Amino acid sequence: MKVTFMGAGSTVFAKNVLGDIMLTPALRECDIALYDIDPERLEESYLMVTALNRNINENRASVSKYLGVEERKDALRGADFVINAIQVGLYDPCTIIDFEVPKKYGLRQTIADSNGIGGIFRALRTIPVLKDFTDDMKEVCPNAYFLNYTNPMAQLAGWLGRYSGVKSVGLCHSVQTCSRGLLDKLDIKYSEPIRERIAGINHMGWLLEIEDADGTDLYPEIRKRAIEVLESGVTDHNDLVRFEYIRRFGYYCTESSEHNAEYNNFFIKAKYPELIERYNIPLDEYPRRCVEQIKNWKNEKDNYIHDKVSHERTKEYASYIIEAIVTDNPYKIGGNVINRGLIPNLPNDACVEVACLVNKCGIQPCRQEPLPLQLAAMNNLMINVQLLTIEAAVTQKKDYIYQAAMLDPHTSSELSIDEIVRLCDDLIEAHGDYLPKYF
């Protein structure tokens, strides 16, 4: 069995995923191919993975590295699973562009990696690279599974599912941590195992039902305590946006408050600057994290490539998916797939995040009941933008970029239609060769 890791320069994440594989008995003797276009980061990851293989896996795995476009097909050749963790354009210059150009128009963001104007342009510069990857896969590993971790998830997994021609699923961390994280924040005691039902779209999947092992419905207490937090006037809590979702829409969603603050037209308002403090919204949070991670990596990288590096299996889905397919031991995940009727009141071509059963037959998404009307409406605001962004990437027509931005709730609530067009033109120019030519 061969696993190819695209974007292996993401050393910490590569450690988590590949370390998980090495700690899975059925997968320990696999071939691991590391691919990146940055020679220094690739070498650091190679040193880390080989040390990890030696320390926790008795060198059972075979580890090789491949640098640059010229070696990409060799990295993919014969792969059974391809794990994608690339970031096109990195923090500098592209994340800086995503934040600084909109700021000139008075448009502020928190994360900008999934939805909003930042998510649109992150998708537009990434989809062409995914097309190169999957075109190569169809030639040298046509039966491989493509496990995508790169954001913006809904746009990328949506494109993969409709246009790539390879088996794929989009994977995020938010589903696994949603319920227990919420209960811990509200200090609600519960008995394991929890039974939950989550469905929606990536970063806006809805916790529709939650019961503890005794069959107790936990939502009444969740709603009560979330509203108590909001009414207390506290401003240093990190989940006030999602608690407002509970109060106003009745349900909690999977991704963090800093993400969801920029997914709608409620919270980041030039006209109401006091909302930033009221909801503890961290503007420019993602650039701040990037700078901190770059700084920390310089201090910590020796710990990762040092001989003593070790690992404990994480909750990342990748190793569990591979194990379930290889061993036919079923496993349930929250996966991002094309809707095709899975959630009846969302568009057929939308990328939805639903429960999926994984076994030797592959990744099989499970049909859901219709979402509550208000939740489907919230999801559709995002889906409209995501579908138009994919259409822009496929057709290379600039009008679809404009239309996606015009329909984005946050962008359109702050800027005029003419400003949105000018902003898109400025972002296209600033991205330069990171984008294909649009007409």
Question: PLM ranges: what are they?
Answer:
Residues 4, 31-33, 167-187, 194-197:
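Catalytic or ion-translocation cores adjacent to nucleophile or general acid/base/metal-coordination motifs
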Residues 23-60:
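Glycine-rich phosphate-binding loop and adjoining beta1-alpha1-beta2 segment
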Residues 81-103:
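Short, solvent-exposed beta-strand-terminating loops
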Residues 104-162, 167-175, 179:
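Rossmann-like NAD(P)(H) cofactor-binding subdomain of soluble oxidoreductases
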Residues 54-80, 87-90, 109-119, 123, ...:
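A structured beta-alpha segment of the ubiquitous adenosine-cofactor-binding alpha/beta core
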